[in-house]
A protein has these predicted regions:
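A short, Lys/Arg-rich alpha-helix, primarily the initiator
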Residues: 1-41
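Short, charged recognition helix plus adjacent turn
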Residues: 1-10, 81, 87-100
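DNA-binding alpha-helical recognition surfaces that contact promoter or target DNA
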Residues: 21, 51, 92
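Short amphipathic helical patch at the helix-1/turn junction of helix-turn-helix
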Residues: 28-29, 54, 70, 81
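Helix N-cap/coil-helix junction residues
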Residues: 31-32, 44, 58, 85
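Recognition helix of helix-turn-helix/homeodomain-like DNA-binding domains
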Residues: 40-71
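DNA major-groove recognition helix of helix-turn-helix/homeodomain DNA-binding modules
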Residues: 65-89
């Protein structure tokens, strides 16, 4: 039986993109040194998020489709609890990314 590959919803794609945008922001703010460091700190799979960055990142690789379709809940939790990132912005795209 062929494997069915589900296409992520536009909601999931938006959250994926905003998550990776937020990671870039905390790196540029000096809160964490790189995506890999964030993953190490919170026991996440760096290869997973590097691959997702090729599809959903700030500068995606044209035509590349990640095997991973969604950001893990643990990654979202770690981002909004430990950094000045708005959970409302991350989930809905409304408001500002950074919390003052």
């Amino acid at each position: 039986m062929p494997r069915t590959i589900a296409k992520p919803s536009t909601i999931s794609e938006g959250i994926n993109r905003r998550f990776l945008e937020a990671i870039e922001a905390i790196v540029s703010l000096g809160k964490v040194s790189a995506l890999e460091a964030f993953c190490t700190l919170y026991d996440l799979s760096a290869p997973r998020y590097r691959e997702m960055r090729l599809t959903y990142g700030v500068s995606p690789k044209p035509g590349y489709q990640s095997r991973y379709k969604n950001i893990e809940v643990e990654a979202i939790y770690s981002l909004v609890v430990n950094y000045p990132i708005s959970s409302r912005w991350l989930i809905t795209g409304r408001g500002k990314m950074l919390i003052e």
